[in-house]
């Protein structure tokens, strides 16, 4: 029986269908302009950009210009690239312009779709960012699509790893900037560690289109971008605690695979306390006393390292290092490290060299970074399953765009076996059968371990005509993917998310030409061989089509339906035929964790014999329910993490905005004076409380405070002994004395140097205290969960205590700045080598690329600024024997270097 909702959808279409139909009027209007645009000369078409900008200046909106602007881009793409955006691509572009996520299947031309809203929004002159998952895609897309923008008079920049600040500044100044999500986030953090506005590279956050938006805004939401510096070596502590874990028995701890958590039981806690006491590591009586917070953190990490992290699944050991394996893609992530001591715990477990922990200097999550943009949109092939999350967290609606050609892929029901052995035997038989009939096959696994297990089984069965694509062999990855569509090819791959490469039936002709003709010079011979390769690939494509297209065989279900859908989506691109099927067993991770006993009992009752499989839509539905549970749990985790991160983010925004104001201000003297006066008021009110009798005044303490914060020896006890003196009189006298001393120093230094000194001291002190504050919040976060046992809401407690810590930061800032400025002296510089900045490193555990963009070289927080001869504040650190930047021709040490604050 059809439900009322189903009947309504049948009559009126779904909400998605209705929204897509709503764009048809504008699509028709764009199509109506096509002949007019074709008739324009190249110059006249390019001149449309100036015309549109003039119309914007006269009061028109971007929405008013959408139809003609899209028509211009379509014609430019046809002339420059030979590509004409289809009607569905125009719809995809409108969805992006309207701050939504455009879900378009693999091979539907998302890269070209982005050019439409990018051009339209770039007309506003505020800069548009197109976000990709790796440097290769950023450069490829900027190179290709930049030709369209260039033809229309817009500039295109690309941000990749290894650029100088000047190159980055130029790229961000362009109308359109292609960049990876990591580079954007790190540039934002680095900009907010600089001391001059001119040193900053980004110019604002207007409009961003995020490619693979589900990977970046969902998969990576739990892994912040971090810039860090090293702490002291604590390898002895890690090794000592690591040695305790094997001494525990199974009843000493509880493991929850679903929640990825490990906790000690009461017996385990007692045993651990005795071991820690013997090692001299336990303070007080209980492990959970507040002074043992750091030790609790270390023992929990050690337990997780032994009981939750599996070698060759979660990480591998290579060259005496722990290398993380990405759970989504199966790729190695060299240089990436687990944070908060977890990586060191794994190093201790595997007896490899323990690298020192890092202190966080600056961090931001992608959730909070991308929410800074005035307009945000995204593209992906798989977003519908995460629609609720996109709506709740980012305010983004997911709109499914129909394919240009109907999808011909057959998605078959799962085959479920009782044991993994039976499942693998069936998979091997299926692989051999597909190979014999010439059907290209992509075999998806969930980990390196599983892909190598299957490869070994295939070899033992006498079949060796396959390629393995996983973290161990990623150097050959591009070529393997390029040939995965050749008839009879068998490619075993860990999860294919974020690969960024289409599997073309018959193989990729461009990749073959690049590889086979790399040494052949341009000319008739090369042209003939290129033609031959293209003809051969076309014949192979026809053969693959006759065999049924690409067959995606998955050996296990991932806990996320989206990752499964990404794997399926590799087949059936651009209307090609294809097939997808999942082979499962009760012993698979997902089945084992979610109700496998019940299903195993049911299969036994059905009388399932060895080697037989059950295929039924009910099984698919049961698995989908299990996956939905996991997805809901993961969403709750991300939502909860965001609530905590929002507390830090609000404070981060205040600090970063304050830094910008300090950098932009002509002088910070008024700010410094306000800080000084607040410190005076604080110490006077503390030592001389309101309405207190003179005998209750702590004048000795006040005298000491004035000495500590202002470097002045004032006769406070003598003032207090005067007849009829009031607390206001003492406040006025202290203020007058401090102001006079500050004015005398300012006159002695001169206004130019004093401004430089004040700004430098305030910014550097603020940065130092902010870093300490981040560490304090991390520590608070690690223990706040225990408040739940006292029937108090941990989040509210965290908000309250984080606010108190922030207020303390502001008090410390006022005191530290006041104390430092009242002590700083101009001294003749003694010969010494310039001190280098401490090493800093960017980190981000990236669930997509596995490419180590940020571990190659230190990320220094302060890059050299452009030097203005008239502005000593712009010179930064100058070597003693360098020519003085003022242009005098003297060495710095004999000119402005004589004095150093």
Curated annotation (Swiss-Prot):
Record's bilayer topology term: Peripheral membrane protein
Keywords (A to Z) from UniProt: ATP-binding, Cell inner membrane, Cell membrane, Cytoplasm, Membrane, Metal-binding, Nucleotide-binding, Protein transport, Translocase, Translocation, Transport, Zinc
SMART domains the UniProt entry points to: SecA_DEAD, SecA_PP_bind
Catalytic activity: ATP + H2O + cellular proteinSide 1 = ADP + phosphate + cellular proteinSide 2
A GO MF label: metal ion binding
UniProt GO BP: intracellular protein transmembrane transport; protein import; protein targeting; protein transport by the Sec complex
Binding locations of Zn(2+): 884, 886, 895-896
A single GO cellular-component term on record: cell envelope Sec protein transport complex
Top-rank lineage group of the source organism: Bacteria
Enzyme Commission number(s) from the entry: 7.4.2.8
Cofactor(s), by name: Zn(2+)
NCBIfam families per the UniProt record, alphabetical: PRK12904.1, secA
Biological function: Part of the Sec protein translocase complex. Interacts with the SecYEG preprotein conducting channel. Has a central role in coupling the hydrolysis of ATP to the transfer of proteins into and across the cell membrane, serving both as a receptor for the preprotein-SecB complex and as an ATP-driven molecular motor driving the stepwise translocation of polypeptide chains across the membrane.
Complex formation: Monomer and homodimer. Part of the essential Sec protein translocation apparatus which comprises SecA, SecYEG and auxiliary proteins SecDF-YajC and YidC.
Record's protein name: Protein translocase subunit SecA
Classification of source organism: Bacteria, Pseudomonadati, Pseudomonadota, Alphaproteobacteria, Hyphomicrobiales
Gene responsible for this protein: secA
């Amino acid at each position: 029986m059809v439900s009322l909702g189903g009947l309504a959808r049948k009559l009126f279409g779904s909400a998605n269908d209705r929204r897509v139909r709503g764009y048809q009027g504008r699509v028709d209007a764009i199509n109506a302009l096509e002949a007019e645009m074709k008739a324009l000369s190249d110059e006249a078409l390019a001149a449309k950009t100036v015309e549109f900008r003039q119309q914007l200046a006269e009061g028109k909106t971007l929405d008013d210009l959408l139809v003609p602007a899209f028509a211009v881009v379509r014609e430019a793409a046809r002339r420059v690239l030979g590509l004409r955006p289809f009607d569905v691509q125009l719809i995809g572009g409108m969805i992006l312009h309207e701050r939504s996520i455009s879900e378009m299947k693999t091979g539907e031309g998302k890269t070209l779709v982005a050019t439409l809203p990018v051009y339209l929004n770039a007309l506003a002159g505020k800069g548009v960012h197109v976000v990709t998952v790796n440097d290769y895609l950023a450069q490829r897309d900027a190179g290709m699509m930049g030709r369209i923008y260039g033809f229309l008079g817009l500039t295109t920049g690309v941000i990749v790893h290894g650029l100088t600040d000047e190159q980055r500044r130029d790229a961000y100044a362009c109308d359109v900037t292609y960049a990876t999500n990591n580079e954007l986030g790190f540039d934002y953090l680095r900009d907010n560690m600089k001391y001059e506005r001119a040193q900053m590279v980004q110019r604002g956050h207007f409009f961003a289109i995020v490619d693979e938006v589900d990977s970046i805004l969902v998969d990576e939401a739990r892994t912040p971008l971090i810039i860090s510096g090293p702490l002291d070596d604590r390898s002895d502590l890690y090794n000592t605690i690591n040695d305790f874990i094997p001494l525990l028995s199974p009843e000493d701890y509880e493991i929850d695979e679903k929640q990825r958590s490990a906790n000690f039981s009461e017996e385990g806690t007692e045993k651990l306390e005795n071991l820690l006491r013997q090692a001299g590591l336990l303070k007080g009586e209980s492990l959970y006393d507040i002074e043992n917070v750091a030790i609790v953190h270390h023992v929990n990490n050690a337990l997780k390292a032994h009981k939750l992290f599996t070698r060759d699944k979660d990480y591998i050991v290579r060259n005496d290092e722990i290398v993380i394996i990405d759970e989504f893609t199966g790729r190695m992530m060299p240089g990436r490290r687990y944070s908060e001591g977890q990586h060191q715990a794994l190093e201790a477990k595997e007896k490899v060299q323990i690298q020192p922990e890092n202190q966080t200097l600056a961090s931001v999550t992608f959730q909070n970074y991308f929410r800074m943009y005035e307009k945000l949109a995204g593209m992906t092939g798989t977003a519908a399953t995460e629609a609720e999350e996109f709506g709740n967290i980012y305010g983004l609606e997911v709109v499914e765009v129909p394919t240009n050609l109907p999808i011909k892929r057959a998605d078959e029901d799962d085959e479920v076996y009782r044991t993994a052995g039976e499942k693998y035997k069936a998979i091997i038989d299926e692989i051999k059968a597909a190979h014999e009939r010439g059907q290209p096959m992509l075999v998806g696994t969930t980990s390196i371990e599983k892909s190598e297990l299957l490869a070994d089984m295939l070899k033992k069965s006498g079949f060796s005509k396959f390629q393995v694509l996983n973290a161990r062999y990623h150097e050959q990855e591009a070529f393997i993917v390029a040939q995965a569509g050749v008839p009879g090819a068998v490619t075993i791959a860990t999860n294919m998310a974020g690969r960024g490469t289409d599997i073309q039936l018959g193989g990729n002709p461009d990749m073959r030409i690049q590889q086979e003709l790399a040494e052949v010079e341009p000319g008739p011979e090369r042209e003939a061989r290129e033609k031959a390769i293209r003809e051969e690939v076309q014949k192979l494509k026809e053969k693959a089509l006759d065999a049924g297209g690409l067959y995606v065989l998955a050996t296990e279900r991932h806990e996320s339906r989206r990752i499964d859908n990404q794997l399926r989506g590799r087949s059936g691109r651009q209307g090609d035929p294809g097939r997808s099927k999942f082979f499962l067993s009760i012993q698979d991770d997902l089945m084992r964790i979610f109700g496998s006993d019940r299903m195993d009992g049911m299969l036994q009752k059905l009388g399932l014999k060895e080697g037989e499989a059950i295929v039924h839509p009910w099984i698919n539905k049961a698995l989908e329910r299990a996956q939905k549970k996991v997805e809901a749990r993961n969403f709750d985790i991300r939502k909860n993490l965001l609530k905590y991160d929002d507390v830090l983010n609000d404070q981060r925004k205040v600090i970063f905005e304050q830094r910008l104001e300090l950098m932009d201000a002509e002088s910070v003297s008024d700010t410094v004076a306000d800080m000084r006066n607040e410190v005076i008021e604080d110490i006077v009110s503390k030592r001389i409380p309101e309405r207190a009798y003179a005998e209750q005044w702590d004048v000795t303490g006040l005298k000491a405070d004035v000495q500590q914060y202002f470097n002045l020896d004032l006769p406070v006890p003598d003032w207090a002994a005067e007849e009829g003196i009031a607390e206001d009189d003492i406040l006025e006298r202290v203020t007058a004395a401090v102001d006079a001393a500050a004015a005398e120093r300012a006159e002695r230094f001169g206004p130019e140097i004093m401004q430089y000194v004040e700004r430098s001291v305030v910014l550097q002190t603020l940065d130092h205290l902010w870093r300490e504050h981040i560490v304090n919040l991390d520590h608070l976060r690690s223990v706040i969960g225990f408040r739940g046992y006292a029937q108090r809401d941990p989040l509210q407690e965290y908000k309250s205590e984080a606010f108190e810590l922030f207020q303390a930061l502001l008090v410390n800032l006022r005191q530290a700045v006041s104390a430092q400025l009242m002590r700083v002296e101009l001294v003749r510089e003694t010969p010494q080598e310039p001190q280098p900045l401490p090493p800093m490193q960017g980190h981000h555990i990236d669930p997509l690329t596995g490419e180590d963009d940020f571990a190659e070289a230190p990320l220094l927080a302060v890059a050299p600024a452009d030097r203005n001869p008239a502005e000593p504040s712009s010179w930064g650190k100058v070597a003693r024997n360098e020519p003085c930047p003022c242009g005098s021709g003297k060495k710095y040490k004999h000119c402005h270097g004589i004095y150093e604050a």
